[in-house]
Curated annotation (Swiss-Prot):
Annotated transmembrane regions: 13-33, 39-59, 81-101, 117-137
Triggers of expression: Part of the probable 18 gene mamAB operon.
Binding site for Fe cation 1: 249, 285
Chain spans, region Transmembrane domain (TMD): 1-210
Binding-site positions, Fe cation 2: 264
A Pfam family it matches: ZT_dimer
Organism: Paramagnetospirillum magneticum (strain ATCC 700264 / AMB-1) (Magnetospirillum magneticum)
Intracellular or extracellular location(s): Magnetosome membrane; Cell inner membrane
First-listed, main subcellular location of the protein, grouped into a coarse class: membrane
Membrane topology: Multi-pass membrane protein
UniProt superkingdom: Bacteria
Entry protein name: Magnetosome protein MamM
Subunit and interaction comment: Forms homodimers via its C-terminal domain (CTD) in the presence of metal cations. Interacts with MamB via their CTD.
Classification lineage: Bacteria, Pseudomonadati, Pseudomonadota, Alphaproteobacteria, Rhodospirillales
């Protein structure tokens, strides 16, 4: 990580999020009940969602940080994707119920009420807190590349937007004499929660499928390797995400006149260069093949996973 404080933040963000969102959830539920706001009650679900997500961060980061062992040669990084999927499924179910309830209230004019102004102030407090938590969790997510902390940042962004909508709804209900706005905002919030749950679910699904590192990452690895003295281009590269980390192996071209020791030294230099430039490389195995000068063939890429033996070999070499 770039700064020493990043490690502290990555370890504490789950507990901070858990405390903050518990307070916000209680405040929103209490104010929504006494203030008569369906939108604020729906907004409390955002904080409940975030509270559970923060709990998943605490559990997930603890498990995923465990070292490799014989039974888990790829590490424990996938646990974060599993927990993200659990959170998304739970809230898709809960918000489906809330969606039906919001529609019923919106269609029944006898249930339309103008909420108390205390709801407006609670919504503004929620906006401020969630904006601060969004930037905090986004910073940690960038540094750690953790999928569950990325989910946490997305949730805080959505919460700030939802609380802002609640505030606008209260203003409209009070000053424009439109009490139906409050249940309408509640309806919008439940739809937004459903869509957010779908995004989180699909992100977790892709993570569990060990997707390729992507063209941009592959090109960075190739570019870095080819800048190392003695490298006559990258012949083959295989890179994919395992959890939040990248596992890769590559074949580089070297002068046919080089000795085995010289080729090995070049491979080690490539490892050091790539791992030094790219922060999320967990494992990189580099081997060399003879390549004639002037051979400008482009590298080939593979998305097939590494075998168990290759994984253990790369951990020894890296």
């Amino acid at each position: 990580m770039r700064k020493s404080g990043c490690t502290v933040c990555s370890r504490s963000i789950g507990w901070v999020g858990l405390a903050v969102n518990t307070v916000l959830m209680v405040m929103k539920a209490f104010v929504g009940l006494i203030g008569g706001s369906q939108a604020m009650l729906a907004d409390a679900m955002y904080s409940l969602k975030d509270m559970l997500n923060a709990l998943m961060v605490v559990i997930g980061t603890t498990i995923s940080s465990k070292p490799l062992d014989a039974e888990h040669p790829y590490g424990h990084g996938k646990v974060e994707f599993i927990l993200s999927m659990v959170v998304s499924v739970v809230f898709i179910g809960l918000t489906g119920y809330l969606l039906v309830h919001a529609v019923q209230i919106l269609l029944d004019e006898s249930m339309h009420r103008t909420p108390h102004l205390i709801v407006l102030w609670a919504a503004l407090v929620s906006v401020g807190v969630n904006v601060a938590m969004y930037f905090y969790s986004r910073c940690v997510a960038i540094e750690t590349n953790s999928p569950i902390i990325k989910t946490m940042a997305k949730h805080h962004h959505g919460d700030a937007t939802a609380s802002g909508a609640v505030a606008l709804g209260i203003i409209g209900a009070h000053y424009l004499n439109m009490p139906w706005i409050d249940p309408a905002v509640a309806l919008w919030e439940t739809i937004d929660l459903l869509l957010l749950g779908k995004v989180v679910f699909m992100d977790a699904y892709r993570g569990l499928m060990d997707h390729t590192a992507g063209e941009a990452v592959q090109n960075r690895i190739v570019d870095t390797a080819e800048r190392v003295p003695g490298v006559r281009g990258v012949i083959h590269l295989r890179a994919r995400y395992v959890g939040q980390d990248i596992w890769a192996d590559m074949i580089i071209g070297v002068d046919p006149e080089h000795t085995v020791e010289q080729a090995h030294d070049i491979c080690e230099a490539v490892q050091a260069a790539v791992c030094g430039k790219m922060r999320r490389i967990e494992s990189l195995h580099v081997s060399a093949e003879a390549r004639e000068a002037g051979d400008t063939s482009k590298p080939t890429f593979s998305e097939e996973p590494l075998t168990y033996d290759e994984v253990m070999l790369s951990k020894v070499d890296n």
